[in-house]
């Protein structure tokens, strides 16, 4: 299993319940596979460096996971079809 650093940004117009629901859904991808979330941080609502889809702010989330490639591919697929995610990045350490 390899380590991956993942960060994603959610739309700023979501309420706390929606944000929690989306985070739980995205993290559940790794609980279904043999993986471990080593570290995670809810950075919160921050200004974006430039507007994305007419949004100037976003909810930032970051975590490091140790998992297999299959779980990362599934996360990538899900995050691409989740409308609330406006930007994400996955880095293999």
Curated annotation (Swiss-Prot):
Which keywords does this chain's UniProt record carry? Ribonucleoprotein, Ribosomal protein, RNA-binding, rRNA-binding
Q: Which GO terms describe its molecular function?
A: small ribosomal subunit rRNA binding; structural constituent of ribosome
Record keyword Iron present:
no
Q: Which CDD domains match?
A: bS6
Asked if the Swiss-Prot or TrEMBL record annotates the protein with the keyword Ribosomal protein, the reply is: yes
Give the UniProt record's GO annotations in the biological process aspect: translation
Residues of the signal peptide: none
- Please tell me one Gene Ontology term that the record gives under cellular component: cytoplasm
Specify the domain of life of the species encoding this protein.
Bacteria
> Family assignment?
Belongs to the bacterial ribosomal protein bS6 family.
Q: What is this protein called?
A: Small ribosomal subunit protein bS6
Source species, please?
A: Phytoplasma australiense
């Amino acid at each position: 299993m390899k380590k991956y650093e993942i960060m994603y940004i959610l739309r700023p117009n979501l309420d706390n319940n929606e944000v929690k629901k989306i985070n739980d859904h995205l993290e559940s991808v790794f609980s279904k596979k043999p993986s471990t979330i080593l570290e995670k941080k809810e950075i919160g609502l921050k200004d974006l460096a430039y507007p994305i889809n007419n949004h100037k702010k976003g909810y930032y989330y970051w975590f490091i996971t140790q998992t297999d490639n299959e779980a990362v591919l599934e996360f990538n697929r899900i995050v691409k079809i989740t409308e609330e995610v406006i930007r994400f990045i996955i880095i293999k350490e």
